[in-house]
Amino acid sequence: MSFAGATALGIRVEDGVVLAADKRMSYGGFILSRNFKKIFVINDRIGIAFAGLYGDMGGLVRIVEGQMRLASLETGKPATVRNVAKFLSSLLYSYKFFPFNVEAIVGGIDPGGEPKLYVLDPLGSIIEEDYVAAGTGATTAFGLLEHVYKRGMSLEEAKKAAVEALRASMARDAGTGDGIDVLVLPVSGKPSLETIKFRLVEG
């Protein structure tokens, strides 16, 4: 995703899932916006974080939201996190010859109360993990996440780790910056979306 700078990540723990993404919208070396949304809430249990080309994000989200509502009406059951990830995977793969230029992280809580986290590449390959990162700053974010992630960490600790990983990416990746959106999806309780606004200043 070198053409459009962005970093997104996700962490799964026993108490829930954290999704986070930076606020900068850039293309090449030019900053187009410092207040861009890259995290989308599909329903009160599931969210998607994106890195990549910005027009593609909105189009994909509208399709996924509509399909998940329709499926829930037809079956009478709420969508699972894997339902969303698998549908998005199929959608991305169906455009493999003219691919969407995005990487996606799908996370949330299944109806049975189990946290789930998936990462998808532009062609729809899908992997389930405990922590993931995508975008131009993913290498730096992974380095910090591998150091701080531990089984049994709390949801609050996961949130702090996500923020620190994105701050590290902002320090090294010119396409990542200008604040962080953090979506917390707890096993018990309502999701919360928080914006942390700051700009990295040296000295």
UniProtKB/Swiss-Prot annotation:
The 20S proteasome core is composed of 14 alpha and 14 beta subunits that assemble into four stacked heptameric rings, resulting in a barrel-shaped structure. The two inner rings, each composed of seven catalytic beta subunits, are sandwiched by two outer rings, each composed of seven alpha subunits. The catalytic chamber with the active sites is on the inside of the barrel. Has a gated structure, the ends of the cylinder being occluded by the N-termini of the alpha-subunits. Is capped at one or both ends by the proteasome regulatory ATPase, PAN. It holds the Pfam family Proteasome. It comes from Aeropyrum pernix (strain ATCC 700893 / DSM 11879 / JCM 9820 / NBRC 100138 / K1). Belongs to the peptidase T1B family. This is Proteasome subunit beta 1. It is found in: Cytoplasm. The gene is psmB1. Keywords: Autocatalytic cleavage, Cytoplasm, Hydrolase, Protease, Proteasome, Threonine protease, Zymogen. Residues 1-6 form a propeptide. Coiled coil: none annotated. It is an enzyme of class 3 (hydrolase). InterPro entries: Ntn_hydrolases_N (IPR029055), Pept_T1A_Psome_bsu_arc (IPR019983), Pept_T1A_subB (IPR000243), Proteasome_bsu_CS (IPR016050), Proteasome_sua/b (IPR001353), Proteasome_suB-type (IPR023333). Its EC number is 3.4.25.1. One of its GO terms (molecular function) is threonine-type endopeptidase activity. The keyword Nucleus does not apply. It catalyses: Cleavage of peptide bonds with very broad specificity.
